[in-house]
């Protein structure tokens, strides 16, 4: 797999969970002998929802809810077959979305 790289993109609502998952991935990859670039924090996506508190009237009384999506990017340079195998066996929390690309 010489000359290739693997790009891993992580997304989660909780920043502590995503940081611990990124740390696990980096530790696993460095143990197999591949080079790692990252984790690079990408901009946090923030969705704000405005809801009227009353079911009938009082439109001036509103409540705001927000949902933040934290993102991290990890590049694995010069991966070995052992690296790919260890990444497939890695157990990460359910709240983390993982997207793996081979550009």
UniProtKB/Swiss-Prot annotation:
S-S bonds: none
| Assigned keywords, A-Z | Ribonucleoprotein, Ribosomal protein
Q: Which GO terms describe its cellular component?
A: ribonucleoprotein complex; ribosome
Q: Does the keyword Electron transport apply?
A: no
Q: Which domain of life is it from?
A: Bacteria
* InterPro entries on file: Ribosomal_uS10, Ribosomal_uS10_CS, Ribosomal_uS10_dom, Ribosomal_uS10_dom_sf
Report the Gene3D superfamilies cross-referenced here: Ribosomal protein S10 domain
A GO BP term here is: translation
Q: Name one GO molecular function term.
A: tRNA binding
Note whether Ribosomal protein occurs among the keywords: yes
Q: Which Pfam families match?
A: Ribosomal_S10
Q: How does it assemble?
A: Part of the 30S ribosomal subunit.
Described by its record, this protein's role is as follows: Involved in the binding of tRNA to the ribosomes.
- Spell out the family assignment given in the record's similarity comment: Belongs to the universal ribosomal protein uS10 family.
What protein am I looking at?
Small ribosomal subunit protein uS10
Species for this entry: Cutibacterium acnes (strain DSM 16379 / KPA171202) (Propionibacterium acnes)
